[in-house]
Regions:
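Extracellular low-complexity, O-glycosylation-prone Ser/Thr/Pro/Gly-rich "stalks"
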Residues: 2-178
């Protein structure tokens, strides 16, 4: 009975350890001299960041087609209803829809093929806020987009050179106005 109990505890701890090491944290910081309302799909919703504020977002392993973008010129009431000049997602603070163009996008899929995360920046939907996406572990590529048509970002859908990979379990830092 003791062996069975020990094995159950071992596999439980192993499962928890694997799950936590494969999830990712995105620390989203606003360095812009104006307020940015970052939004995140499929988890996270959205919130307001004034200059210098950071929002930490935990994203589960296995998340695919994740997106983070900045909204500008927003005005929300106490119930979270309102609108944004750029990146609006159906007139709500907590986004459940993608942002309306123009939006500079950080895109990601976590713990995919060969235990890798895949990430990119995209200005296919237009450019609205300067952005930098950097993995926190060494050896992975930092992407920066300071203006429309920036060289680190997708400019058209079939550009196979803009997606980058990093080992699963990596955390990321996204900075508006780096």
């Amino acid at each position: 009975m003791t062996l069975l109990k020990s094995l159950c505890v071992f596999f439980f701890l192993l499962a928890i350890s694997f799950t936590f090491t494969q999830a990712a944290r995105f620390d989203i910081t606003n360095n812009c001299p104006y307020t940015v309302w970052p939004a995140a799909l499929p988890t996270g919703g959205g919130q307001q960041l004034t200059q210098g504020q950071t929002w930490s977002l935990d994203v589960p392993a296995g998340t695919t087609s994740g997106r983070i973008w900045g909204r500008t010129g927003c005005n929300f009431d106490g119930s979270g209803r309102g609108s944004c000049s750029t990146g609006d997602c159906g007139g709500v603070l907590q986004c459940k829809l993608s942002g309306a163009p123009p939006t500079t996008l950080a895109e990601f899929s976590l713990n995919q093929f060969n235990n890798l995360d895949f990430y990119d920046l995209s200005v296919i939907d237009g450019f609205n806020v300067p952005m930098q996406l950097s993995p926190t572990s060494g050896g992975c590529t930092t992407l920066t987009c300071l203006a429309d048509k920036c060289p680190d970002a997708y400019l058209f859908p079939d550009d196979n050179t803009k997606t980058h990979s990093c080992p699963s379990g990596t955390n990321y830092r996204l900075v508006f106005c780096p």
